[in-house]
Amino acid sequence: MTEVGVIGGTGFQPGLPERRRTVFTPYGTVRVDITRVGDHRVYFINRHGKGHDLPPHRINYRAIVWAMRELGVKRILATNSVGVINSDEYEPGDIVLPVDFLDFTKRRPTTFYDEKVVHVDVTEPYCPELREALLKAADDLGYTVKEGAVYVATEGPRFETPAEIRAFRKLGGDIVGMTGFPEVVLARELEICYASVCLCTNYAAGIDDRRRTIDEVFELVEELRPKAVELIERCIEYIPPKRSCPCSQALEGAEV
């Protein structure tokens, strides 16, 4: 039986619910919904909390990822809402698997290693095995899922300016969001595989002439949510029992 963690927003819980558990971590308590997909146990954490009351810059990312570790999770699948920067390749309604990121967050804690020196390698930040499983699941379901994007992480809670988006585009950014970082790095620091399923909900500022509103974001999230949940559920069936990716040896040679 593979134990999988899923981090997402309200309504993204996969599988059949079984029970709820509170996990105590050095960084705070985390409420976890335990579900089952086939023979696999799934631990779901709503990163925004009950009622979506936590903005992106106040989410306790370290507690969330540490809770997954406490539960014995070795694979994490996350969902993230994003805006489209590279309109030549992506558009609202797309589901995208990022392969790299640019970090433009400012104040949130981004590491577990404040007391010792650890330089974890993130040459391939998103687990290749999980991405492959997601692509197999998409093919099985007949869904179009695009891979290869560079995710730009911003602090929030405000949307980005057109000037920022132009700069991100020049730096190679394809999509932009507020919740995908530092989860990806925190997972790597604990040698947990991590992949993100990004839901393109709108064009970023300046890409079109429309004003950004949270209503349009939530509207498209609701449209994409059933497909994303089904994709994750099918992906879980394709995850191999044993890991052969570099994520499981991320700390080898990393500590000074």
Swiss-Prot record:
A cellular component term, taken from the record's GO annotations: cytosol
EC class of the enzyme, as a word: transferase
Cross-referenced InterPro entries: MTAP (IPR010044), Nucleoside_phosphorylase_d (IPR000845), Nucleoside_phosphorylase_sf (IPR035994)
Molecular function terms from GO: S-methyl-5-thioadenosine phosphorylase activity
Binding-site positions, phosphate: 10, 47-48, 179
Residues with site note (Important for substrate specificity): 160, 214
Entry function: Catalyzes the reversible phosphorylation of S-methyl-5'-thioinosine (MTI) to hypoxanthine and 5-methylthioribose-1-phosphate. Involved in the breakdown of S-methyl-5'-thioadenosine (MTA), a major by-product of polyamine biosynthesis. Catabolism of (MTA) occurs via deamination to MTI and phosphorolysis to hypoxanthine.
Full protein name: Probable S-methyl-5'-thioinosine phosphorylase
Native species: Methanopyrus kandleri (strain AV19 / DSM 6324 / JCM 9639 / NBRC 100938)
